[in-house]
Design a protein with these regions (language model features):
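Residue-level recognition of short loop/turn positions
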Residues: 23, 61, 236-238
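Pocket-edge positions in alpha/beta enzyme catalytic cores
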Residues: 34-37, 62, 125, 195
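Cysteine/selenocysteine-centered motifs that mediate thiol-based redox chemistry or coordinate metal-sulfur cofactors
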Residues: 264-267
Length: 267
């Protein structure tokens, strides 16, 4: 099956920064979690993540590539057998950056919600997101890096998904297209719930249509229950958490003297 398809059971999401170069109106990052941790503090968090028996780290944010030393952290993680997945909007992922991360990254998940520039702008990604992502897909695949596409389905983009599928049919990626329901938790997402949220039945209807009409695309989907049960996370301020019933359960802080209990033991 190869490393691209190796299943990792102990996964951790690290929202390493809440800073971002986009302003998505569905974003569920914790805006009160901003920090200015240095490399030493981030390395302490990383070592503790590894000590829990973590097999995969999803590097996220905010925009993880805004952290100046994030590649040093990825290098350390890879040295210790971690499967590194980067979730990014791609804006900072030029060819130089791709070459920097290539030895340490296993998968890059590019966030794109539409190939309609006006839709992307209305969601908060800007008019140029389509052009950026198309360029990054090509360059990442040419570099031998696995590429996923992450799409959050909201009222603003649900009618654009067929066009996205047409593009991905003609320009195949080497990973999967992940369609996710809008997750109404924390500041921005919670505030915009009414104007964004798509009914589950409507979501499943378009997902099933896409899977039927575009069998050549590896389409997967995630509902809210799956999203919040997926795996534990570490906030930018070091808080270790799991999410249950749309509420964050803080298990402790990863830079404090008292190490939190192993999150993989939380049911």
């Amino acid at each position: 099956m190869g490393k691209w398809h190796t299943k990792k059971n102990k996964k951790m999401c690290w929202w390493i920064t809440e800073k971002c170069n986009e302003g998505c109106i569905y974003c569920f990052r914790a805006l009160d979690s901003i920090n200015n941790f240095n490399l030493e503090q981030h390395m302490l968090i990383l070592k503790r993540i590894i000590d829990y028996g973590t097999e995969q780290i999803t590097w996220s944010g905010g925009e993880a590539l805004l952290v100046p030393h994030v590649i040093k952290l990825m290098k350390y993680a890879k040295k210790h057998g971690i499967y590194n997945k980067l979730t990014t909007n791609g804006k900072l992922l030029n060819n130089e950056k791709i070459n920097e991360i290539k030895p340490y990254i296993d998968l890059v998940a590019l966030s794109i919600d539409s190939f309609n520039d006006n839709t992307n702008h209305s969601i908060g990604r800007g008019y140029e997101q389509r052009e950026i992502v198309i360029d990054r897909i090509k360059n990442l695949i040419n570099s031998g890096i696995l590429v996923d596409i992450n799409t959050v389905v909201v009222k603003q983009n649900i009618n654009d998904l067929i066009d996205m599928a047409e593009f991905l049919k003609d320009n195949p990626i080497n990973g999967k297209w992940k369609l996710m329901t809008f997750f109404p938790i924390r500041e921005t997402a919670l505030k915009n719930k009414d104007k964004l949220e798509v009914d589950d039945n409507e979501f499943l209807k378009i997902v099933n249509r896409l899977k039927k009409e575009y069998p050549s695309i590896n389409i997967v989907h995630m509902m809210n229950d799956q999203i919040q049960q997926q795996y534990p996370g570490v906030r930018a301020n070091g808080d270790l958490l799991v999410t249950r019933d749309y509420k964050d359960i803080i298990l402790g802080n990863m830079v404090s003297d008292t190490i939190p209990d192993n999150p993989f033991n939380i049911k």
